[in-house]
C-alpha cells in the first residue's frame, strides 16, 4: 500500500478580478481508482484551502492559496510515498513547480509526477513542432524541472494505478502507457 498525495496548486489570478477555483474532479476519479486498489489517498487543494491568502505579484496579478510553509506542513503531516500534482491550466504551472520543489526538499525519495491538461497539451505542441521543420521545438518545461520525476498524459485513471503499483513493488515503469519522461534536455520519451 502506498500513501499518495494528490494536490492542486495555488492559482495565479487577476487582482480584483473574478478568480474561480475549478473542482478537482479529475483528482477525485484518480483517487477513487487508487482507493479501489487499497492505496491511502489524500486530495489537497492549496488554492481552496488558502483562498483568503492573496499575494500581489504586480502587473495586476495575484497568487491565491496557501503559503509554502503551509503546503510543506500538509506534505510532512501526510507523509506520502508519491505526490501527484494536477496542473490543468498554465496559471497553475508555476505553483505546481513550487510544490515539487517543496516535496523534494522534504525527501528526495518521494516520487513526484504531474498531470492534467497543461502537460498533455505541452506534449501535443512538442509533437507538432517536431513534425514541422522550421518550427522551434519547445522544451516541455515541466520535465526540465529536476523535482518532477515524470508526467502522466491523457486520462490518468488507470495509468496512475499501474504506475503506483509498479513503484511500490520496485518494478519497471518504462512500458506504462501514458507516461512522459525526460531522456536528456529537450528530448522526451512518451509511452
Label for each model-derived stretch:
Residues 2:
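Nucleotide donor/acceptor-binding cores
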Residues 8-14:
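Short polar catalytic/cofactor-binding loops
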Residues 14-27:
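Glycine- and acidic-residue-enriched helix-capping/strand-helix junction motifs
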Residues 33-34, 40-191:
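Glycine-rich beta-alpha loop elements in corrinoid/cobalamin-binding modules
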